Amino acid sequence: MAALPMLWTGLVLLGLLGFPQTPAQGHDTVQPNFQQDKFLGRWYSAGLASNSSWFREKKELLFMCQTVVAPSTEGGLNLTSTFLRKNQCETKVMVLQPAGVPGQYTYNSPHWGSFHSLSVVETDYDEYAFLFSKGTKGPGQDFRMATLYSRAQLLKEELKEKFITFSKDQGLTEEDIVFLPQPDKCIQE
């Protein structure tokens, strides 16, 4: 049971940064005229969807985390995520580098020895953002993950439906999707 918090931590980072993968072939769509300055601030990881069998097995054990997005000195983003781990609040910082197109970022994971790509596909900046990662876990193993960021901890039903549609548009199914419950600590409104 002690391994569950570590698995949760890894999955939160998956949602934020994508799965350890090889560089993506081509680029996913990105929010038109993405404005990084409007994307900054506090977000909650409110929904995740993935075609990973591990994710499907563990998704019911996950909780919402809080991420503060700030500009990095290199023009990218610093993501400071706070989450519940072993019944204590833990914070991790990740730096996303710009990938040429506004709204697209890369991250090199020393832990996994891998390269990640992350795209902000759609956002209204004030209420929600849809992020998407894709790649391969190995020969012939396709991986996709959609993430719903929300400015509020409680989601409107319309936003849930919109995320379900977005996830299905990425080739994911209803059973691939989870809306994360709020933990009893570690995040603030």
From Swiss-Prot:
Induction (free text): By IL-1 beta and thyroid hormone. Probably induced by dexamethasone, dihydrotestosterone, progesterone, retinoic acid and retinal. Repressed by the Notch-Hes signaling pathway.
Active site (UniProt): 65 (nucleophile)
Signal peptide: 1-24
Catalytic activity: prostaglandin H2 = prostaglandin D2
Protein's UniProt keywords contain Ribosomal protein: no
Disulphide bonds in the chain: 89-186
Gene Ontology CC annotations of this record: extracellular region; extracellular space; Golgi apparatus; nuclear envelope; nuclear membrane; perinuclear region of cytoplasm; rough endoplasmic reticulum
Main location: endoplasmic reticulum
GO molecular function: fatty acid binding; prostaglandin-D synthase activity; retinoid binding
Result, substituting residue 65 to A/S: Loss of enzymatic activity
Positions annotated with a glycan in the UniProt record: 51, 78
Subunit text: Monomer.
Domain comment (free text): Forms a beta-barrel structure that accommodates hydrophobic ligands in its interior.
Name by which UniProt lists this protein: Prostaglandin-H2 D-isomerase
